[in-house]
């Protein structure tokens, strides 16, 4: 083996060891239950040796020498050993399963906590299905590696040590015959470990892909049905399910080979022992020795199969710990500004997405006064949404500065900064909960019913809420599926109204409403915007004619700015957009 290959192998071993030690730390939190399980396992393993010693004693003293006293004791001795074995087995299994469920819970909590602290860019790059697979399937595999593998390793290792020790006691020379096959077995298992690890990792990846396809197909059912995508989605799922089956079978093949090789090597050892033992032992010693050798095969096979589960668990651990170790949002600011007056300044701001060929925003400079209503218009991809995303720091400025009330947003804590904003986006986000909990969401959860009703009325949502079966306590389904598009939009606006933040971010806030609803909601928004800074993204220019200033964006730059009348008089890009919509 070359030095490079050897270095990689050593690094892989160290990485696996570090992963497993980190995983065991989760189990170590519950060391009392873990210790109880280990003690029970020691007791369980000791009964195996006790059982063989009893067989030897009874065979020699009972069946050979016809000692009736010991023959009468045999049933009680066997029952006692089996009773102790059964009790120890129950305690060890229950205690380890209890620890396993705690480990799964802690892993999921840590993973979800980190998930909630990651930047928006992470969620833009990773699908919900892959994340879901990490939180569900991968954490279960990790728990198995941390508890079941540890439990079986302790139990079977102790059993092997007990059996080998007893065999050495009976005849150390004969025991060495078994030791001859041990190096071959160890070499084979070591050579299989990388294959098991890579197969386990492939299984994790295909599980993530499968969850992703399911999540997309289920959440997009209306689109799937209207465009006849059922067969296409079925083909996608069949393809990824086939990949998963292939990887699972590959893993099973390696595991089966392990078991077969262990059986063959054990058969060689058994044949050699029988060949050399004939005529050298008493009947009891021979029965005990062969019994010990046979009882070795099971634990050795279990340990080899554990290698599969261990490698799958380590592959899962790498996946989950990679997420847990992801860098959270930068939150190094310490300034707390209370309620902002609402001034906004962009100074030489530039941002380019990692995979983009040109900047999304390029050298932006503008100022918004407190209480001013700014409208952003322009063709899709012009940078309007990116600009808005910089204000609450969904993305970080790469060049330049963004200031709120004269304070760089990077110098504020994220909590203080985001308290200044209410957001209504084009993609309305509602949760599978009640109307009340969707309006009084997050930091608003302690709002009174009177305040929620007032916000609903201001958003022209109260009339339809009253008509729901349970009013504010009505469940609205996944992503608000039981409501119309306009109703969902109005709930989102009610949520923004209830927050009563000094700065409003409205991204196509009325795009899903019919003409009558739009008129009512626009009136409510106009009233809400009084004395508040508002930034509105709109394609429907009729909704922003009364804006204090309209900024036209093109390829990340502001190419025009002014009031509605001023821009029409300029007869530039805005005037062309306006004529397209109204003529």
Curated annotation (Swiss-Prot):
Residues 344-580 form the ABC transporter domain. Homodimer. Involved in lipopolysaccharide (LPS) biosynthesis. Translocates lipid A-core from the inner to the outer leaflet of the inner membrane. Transmembrane domains (TMD) form a pore in the inner membrane and the ATP-binding domain (NBD) is responsible for energy generation. It is a multi-pass membrane protein. This is ATP-dependent lipid A-core flippase. Its EC number is 7.5.2.6. The keyword Nucleotide-binding applies. PANTHER family: ATP-BINDING CASSETTE SUB-FAMILY B MEMBER 10, MITOCHONDRIAL, ATP-DEPENDENT PERMEASE MDL1, MITOCHONDRIAL. Residues 34-312 form the ABC transmembrane type-1 domain. PROSITE patterns: ABC_TM1F, ABC_TRANSPORTER_1, ABC_TRANSPORTER_2, MSBA. The chain crosses the membrane at residues 32-52, 71-91, 115-135, 160-180, 259-279, 286-306. In MsbA the ATP-binding domain (NBD) and the transmembrane domain (TMD) are fused. Belongs to the ABC transporter superfamily. Lipid exporter (TC 3.A.1.106) family. Coiled coil: none annotated. Its main location: membrane. It is found in: Cell inner membrane. GO terms for cellular component: plasma membrane.
């Amino acid at each position: 083996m070359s030095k490079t290959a050897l270095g990689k192998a050593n690094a892989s071993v160290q990485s696996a060891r570090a992963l497993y030690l980190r995983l065991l730390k989760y189990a170590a939190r519950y060391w009392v239950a873990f210790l109880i399980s280990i003690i029970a396992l020691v007791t369980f393993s000791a009964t195996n040796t006790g059982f063989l010693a009893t067989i030897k004693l009874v065979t020699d003293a009972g069946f050979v020498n016809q000692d009736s006293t010991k023959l009468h004791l045999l049933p009680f001795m066997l029952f006692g050993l089996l009773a102790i074995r059964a009790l120890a087995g129950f305690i060890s299994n229950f205690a380890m399963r209890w620890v396993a469920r705690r480990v799964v819970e802690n892993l999921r909590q840590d993973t979800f906590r980190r998930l909630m602290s990651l930047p928006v860019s992470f969620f833009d790059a990773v699908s919900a299905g892959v994340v879901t697979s990490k939180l569900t399937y991968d954490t279960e595999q990790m728990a198995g590696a941390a508890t079941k593998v540890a439990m079986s390793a302790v139990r079977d290792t102790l059993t092997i040590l007990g059996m080998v020790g007893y065999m050495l006691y009976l005849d150390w020379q004969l025991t060495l015959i078994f030791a001859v096959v041990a190096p071959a077995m160890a070499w084979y298992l070591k050579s299989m470990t990388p294959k098991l690890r890579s197969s386990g990792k492939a299984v994790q990846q295909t599980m993530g892909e499968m969850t992703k396809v399911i999540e997309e197909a289920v959440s997009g059912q209306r689109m799937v049905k209207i465009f006849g995508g059922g067969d296409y989605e079925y083909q996608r799922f069949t393809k990824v399910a086939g990949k998963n089956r292939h990887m699972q079978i590959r893993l099973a093949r390696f595991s089966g080979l392990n078991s077969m090789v262990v059986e063959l090597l054990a058969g060689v050892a058994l044949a050699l022992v029988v060949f050399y033992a004939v005529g050298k032992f008493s009947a009891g010693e021979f029965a005990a020795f062969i019994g010990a050798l046979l009882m070795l095969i099971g634990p050795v096979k279990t340990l080899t199969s554990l290698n599969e589960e261990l490698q799958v668990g380590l592959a899962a651990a790498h996946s989950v710990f990679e997420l847990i170790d992801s860098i959270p949002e930068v939150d190094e600011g310490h300034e707390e500004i209370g309620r902002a007056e609402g001034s906004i300044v962009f100074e030489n701001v530039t941002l380019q997405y990692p995979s983009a060929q040109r900047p999304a925003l390029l050298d932006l400079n503008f100022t918004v006064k407190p209480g001013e209503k700014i409208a952003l218009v322009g063709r899709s991809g012009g940078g309007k949404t990116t600009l808005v995303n910089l204000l609450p720091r969904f993305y970080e400025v790469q060049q330049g500065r963004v200031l709120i009330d004269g304070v760089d947003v990077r110098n504020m804590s994220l909590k203080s900064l985001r308290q200044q904003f209410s957001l209504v986006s084009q993609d309305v986000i509602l949760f599978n909960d009640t109307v009340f909990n969707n309006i009084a969401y997050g930091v608003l959860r302690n709002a009174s019913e009177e305040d929620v009703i007032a916000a609903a009325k201001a958003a022209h949502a109260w009339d339809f809420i009253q008509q729901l079966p349970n009013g504010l306590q009505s469940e609205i389904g996944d992503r608000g599926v039981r409501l119309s598009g306009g109703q969902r939009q109005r709930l989102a606006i009610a949520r923004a109204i209830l927050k009563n933040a000094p700065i409003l971010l409205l991204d196509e806030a009325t795009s899903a409403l019919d003409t009558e609803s739009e008129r009512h909601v626009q009136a409510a928004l106009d009233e809400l915007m009084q004395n508040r800074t508002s930034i509105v993204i709109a394609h429907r220019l009729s909704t922003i004619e009364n804006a204090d200033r309209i900024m036209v964006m093109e390829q990340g730059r502001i190419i025009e700015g002014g009031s509605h009348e001023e821009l029409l008089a300029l007869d530039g890009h805005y005037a062309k957009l306006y004529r397209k919509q109204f003529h």
